[in-house]
Curated annotation (Swiss-Prot):
Disulfide bridges in this chain: none
Gene3D superfamilies hit by this protein: Ribosomal protein S8
UniProt GO BP: translation
Spans annotated as Disordered: 37-70
Keyword Heme attributed: no
The name this protein goes by in its record: Small ribosomal subunit protein bS21C
Compositional bias (Basic residues): 45-70
Length: 70
């Protein structure tokens, strides 16, 4: 459960922003959206595999030296 302590003389908007940020850090919103509808295990594996491949490609691209522009 995510909780925040409201500081004295703190505007509600600032406290709400801190609360939203803390929820995003915990991954609660992402998990909630994932659980709104059922995803078949094969579809879930396929999605996770595609994400892993994309991460790997991005990592390889970043590790390569930049192309020469001449």
């Amino acid at each position: 459960m995510t909780t925040i302590v409201l500081n004295p003389n703190e505007p509600v908007e600032v406290a709400l922003r801190r609360f939203r940020r803390s929820i995003e850090r915990t991954g609660l919103i992402k998990e909630l959206r994932a659980r709104t509808s059922y995803e078949k295990p094969t579809t879930e594996r396929k999605r996770k595999k595609a994400a892993a491949v994309a991460r790997l490609r991005k990592q390889v691209r970043r590790s390569m030296p930049p192309k020469k522009k001449y």
